[in-house]
Structure formats: C-alpha cells, structure tokens
Amino acid sequence: DDLRYHKALKEDGFEIQVLPTFRPDKALGIDKADFAEYIAKLSEVVGYEIDSIETLKKALEERINYFAEVGCRVSDHGLDENLYIKASEEEVDAIFKKALAGEKLTAEEIKKFKGNVLVFLGSHYHKRNWTMQLHIGAVRNNSTRMFEKLGPDAGFDSIDDICYAKELSALLNAMDYNAELPKT
C-alpha cells in the first residue's frame, strides 16, 4: 500500500486523525498459491530482488518504517492456524527458497517460517512501541454469495475452534525472551 489516501487526508487538513495499520499477512502467506507473486510485487515496491529470508526481512523493515512515517502505531495479523515452531535462520531461509521455487511445504515448515517472521516483526513493533493485534483462528469467507460478489476477506468470517494456546504461548515467549514482546 502506498498510503496515498492517508497522506491526502493529512495534507487536506482533515480534522480527524486517520492512521494506517500495518497488515503484512501476504508476506506471511507462504502456504498460499500467490505467495511468489506477492514477493515479486514487494520486490518491485522496495526496488531490489527478494530472494532470501534476509532480503524479505529487510523489505518488511523498510515497509514498517514507511508506515511509521505516515503515523502507523498498530500492526494487524490474521492467523488462521497454529503458528509457531522454533527454527534457525538457515532453516527458514531454505523454506523460503523452497516456496519461491514452487515446491510444496510441510505443515511444520509453514509454522517455522511464520513463527520466525512473526518474532522478527514483533521485535520491530516493540522498538516502535506499536501494538501487535493477532486475530487467530478465523474461518474465512463463509458466505459464498458475498464472496462471489465482493471477493475474499470482505468481512464474512467467523471464529474457528482450533487449539492454539501452546503455540501462541511459545510465540509470545520467543518475542519476550529478548525483551522484545510488543503490546499485544
């Protein structure tokens, strides 16, 4: 998002403060069919090739900085499933490259990638005193009629009944271990 409307409201002297929210769900969507396409689009936005976990994190940090410049103070994450297994940077880099190559990932690899990136993001939110919102366990796009009319993620979701407490605890603990747990 180029945040042009947020900038325009500010420039026009709109009296009510309208601040952006940072929502990097697509950067975490390594299990989605359009993940490589999104990474290519993000590469265009930042102006360099994103071909490793290091360059992905660099790009995400740049986007966080951009959103912060426009007044962002909150991140928002839609997490559909269990979300954390500890992994090394080398493991996560290999998983990222595997996904970019179009190879199928295991459930464990998806959790390792998402958990690693969430911990990274959490540390940056903490540094900026941002709030990190986590929407866990949503059943998406429940209304076929509205999905066909409006497309995905248009507000027709509901709560799922998955168990996520242990992995959520592990994720928050990983962020807190280095005293980098953002407000959640």
Model segments located where?
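Histidine/acidic residue-rich metal-binding segments in metalloenzymes
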Residues: 2-15, 38-183
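Short, conserved acidic/polar surface loops in the N-terminal third of protein domains
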Residues: 5, 31-33
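Phosphate-/polyanion-interacting regions in eukaryotic proteins
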Residues: 10-14, 21-28
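A conserved mid-domain beta-alpha-beta active-site/ligand-binding segment of alpha/beta enzyme cores
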Residues: 30-31, 38
